[in-house]
C-alpha cells in the first residue's frame, strides 16, 4: 500500500498527490511515469511523474479527471492509500542522458500546455540543478488554469506564461510566443513540447519550419502503460512505436499526429476498437483489461 501524504486541488479540475513510494523515488528520472491502482479491482492509470524527493521517498503526480477512474481518484485525501504504485516506467528524458558540459552549451526551450506543465517541471528542475537554465513557455486557456507557476519560475532561465484569453502573460497560443522569441534573436538548439496532442502538432509544424529539433512526449495516448492494449501505437517516421514502452519521448517532426489523434478517439468506443483490430490485426495483444479489447 502506498500512502498519500499530500492531496491538493491545484486549480479547477487539476489535482496533485504526493505519495510515499520509496523504491520509485529512489530510481526514477525526469520523463518517466508510474501506473497507479486505487484498489484490487481498479483500473491501471498511467501518470507522468511531476516531482520526486529521494530523501523523503515520495513521488508527486498531477492529473486531470477525464474518466470514471480518475474522477473517483480525485476524491482521495491525505492519509488514503493506493493499492499499487508501479514504476518508474518508460524511458527517461533524453536530456538527462546527455553530457552536462554539452548541455550547458545548448539553448533549450520547453513548451507545455495545460496539465502538460507537470511533466515539463521535473525536466526543467533537473537541468537547473545541474547548472542549465532553460526557457519555458506554458500555455493555458485562462490565468486560473495555469499550474505550478511558482515552482516553474524558480527553476527556469526565463518563464513565459501564455493565456488564450489574454488574462495573464502573453495573449495567445504558445506557438506565437515561440515565434516571438525566435524573432527576438533566440537561437534554440532543441525544443521539448509536452501537452495536448493538437498543441504538440502545431508546435512541431512551427519548429520544423524554424529548423529547431523538437522532442515530444506522447503520454496523452497511453491507456494501460505496458504496450498490451495498443492504444499508444503510433507511427514515428516509417516505424511503428508504442509510447509506453518505446517512449514516451519521440522526434516530434517524425510523429504522425493526425493518425495518433484519430486512434485516440477510436479507442474510446467499442466500435472504434473493433475497427482498429480489423485494420491492424494484432494491435491488441490481450490481457490488459483496460481498453475493452478482450470483450
Q: Which role does the model predict for each range below?
A:
Residues 39, 87-88, 237:
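Short, surface-exposed secondary-structure boundary micro-motifs
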Amino acid at each position: 500500500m502506498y500512502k498519500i501524504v499530500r492531496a491538493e486541488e491545484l486549480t479547477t479540475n487539476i489535482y496533485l498527490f504526493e505519495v510515499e513510494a520509496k523504491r520509485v523515488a529512489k530510481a526514477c528520472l525526469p520523463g518517466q511515469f508510474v501506473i497507479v491502482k486505487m484498489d484490487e479491482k481498479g483500473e491501471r492509470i498511467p501518470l507522468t511523474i511531476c516531482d520526486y524527493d529521494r530523501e523523503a521517498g515520495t513521488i508527486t503526480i498531477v492529473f486531470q479527471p477525464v474518466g470514471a477512474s480518475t474522477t473517483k481518484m480525485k476524491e482521495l485525501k491525505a492519509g488514503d492509500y493506493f493499492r499499487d504504485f508501479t514504476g518508474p516506467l518508460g524511458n527517461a528524458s533524453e536530456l538527462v542522458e546527455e553530457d552536462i558540459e554539452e548541455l550547458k552549451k545548448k539553448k533549450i526551450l520547453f513548451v507545455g500546455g495545460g496539465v502538460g506543465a507537470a511533466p515539463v517541471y521535473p525536466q526543467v528542475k533537473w537541468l537547473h540543478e545541474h547548472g542549465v537554465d532553460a526557457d519555458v513557455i506554458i500555455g493555458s486557456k485562462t490565468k486560473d488554469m495555469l499550474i505550478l507557476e511558482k515552482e516553474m519560475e524558480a527553476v527556469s532561465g526565463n518563464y513565459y506564461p501564455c493565456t488564450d484569453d489574454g488574462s495573464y502573460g502573453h495573449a495567445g497560443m504558445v506557438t506565437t510566443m515561440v515565434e516571438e522569441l525566435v524573432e527576438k534573436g533566440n537561437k534554440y538548439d532543441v525544443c521539448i513540447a509536452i501537452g495536448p496532442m493538437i498543441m504538440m502538432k502545431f508546435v512541431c509544424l512551427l519548429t520544423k519550419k524554424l529548423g529547431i529539433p523538437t522532442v515530444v512526449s506522447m503520454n496523452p495516448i497511453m491507456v494501460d502503460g505496458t504496450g498490451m492494449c495498443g492504444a499508444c501505437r503510433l507511427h514515428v517516421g516509417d516505424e511503428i512505436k508504442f509510447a509506453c514502452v518505446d517512449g514516451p519521448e519521440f522526434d516530434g517532426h517524425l510523429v504522425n499526429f493526425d493518425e495518433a489523434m484519430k486512434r485516440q478517439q477510436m479507442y474510446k468506443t467499442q466500435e472504434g476498437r473493433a475497427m482498429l483490430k480489423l485494420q491492424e490485426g494484432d494491435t491488441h495483444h490481450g490481457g490488459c483489461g483496460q481498453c475493452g479489447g478482450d470483450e
